[in-house]
Amino acid sequence: MVTTKRYTLPPLPYAYNALEPYISAEIMQLHHQKHHQGYVNGANAALEKLEKFRKGEAQIDIRAVLRDLSFHLNGHILHSIFWPNMAPPGKGGGKPGGKIADLINKFFGSFEKFKEEFSQAAKNVEGVGWAILVYEPLEEQLLILQIEKHNLMHAADAQVLLALDVWEHAYYLQYKNDRGSYVDNWWNVVNWDDVERRLQKALNGQIALKL
């Protein structure tokens, strides 16, 4: 018997207007209901094609299908981290504590230096993509990486702890072409408790995505 599981859109852990004034309710609703849902649908469509291929019911362009799966599945995964990585003003923002603060100081020198490097990474993604903070288990270190689109330039073994979407759909309705202001304001809603939980999972050899 050949089967593949299907992905579903996770609910947001807060209301669509909860991140205002930094991210508008209109952006959040469109981003979640349309864009994220589109990545879920795209991943499931690719899986359906693969399932039919494995059953001998259809021929496919394997390269194209796997490219689609990589793009849409990574879009789904990154957004599933992005939403809980944020919290309403007052609950999000500020400086981290706990182990994540210790490791940020160890690998970046200070929170201020980390924030500047991460912001520059986000502002300078070429085209569309993400800035991410990862725990890299091979050398047990924190790294800041850029992802182009959803699936290019990512370290294969890295556990994503913090993700910032810099596709235009994440900010354009509110910030127009001013990605820099969006990135600067995003720090006011970063959920450091969520980042800490992901780090603790990664340090214990567990999957940081599953909280």
Curated annotation (Swiss-Prot):
Describe how the cofactor binds. Binds 1 Fe cation per subunit.
Q: Which UniProt keywords apply?
A: Iron, Metal-binding, Oxidoreductase
GO MF annotations, alphabetized: metal ion binding; superoxide dismutase activity
Instruction: Determine the domain of life of the protein's source.
Output: Archaea
Q: Which cofactors does the annotated protein need, by name?
A: Fe cation
Q: What class of enzyme is it?
A: oxidoreductase
Disulphide bonds in the chain: none
Binding of Fe cation occurs at: H31, H79, D165, H169
Reply yes or no: does the keyword Transferase apply: no
Q: Does the keyword Oxidoreductase apply?
A: yes
Q: Name the Enzyme Commission number(s) assigned to this protein.
A: 1.15.1.1
Q: Which reaction does it catalyse?
A: 2 superoxide + 2 H(+) = H2O2 + O2
What this protein is reported to do is described as: Destroys superoxide anion radicals which are normally produced within the cells and which are toxic to biological systems.
Task: Give the family from UniProt.
Answer: Belongs to the iron/manganese superoxide dismutase family.
Q: How does it assemble?
A: Homotetramer.
Protein name (Swiss-Prot/TrEMBL) = Superoxide dismutase [Fe]
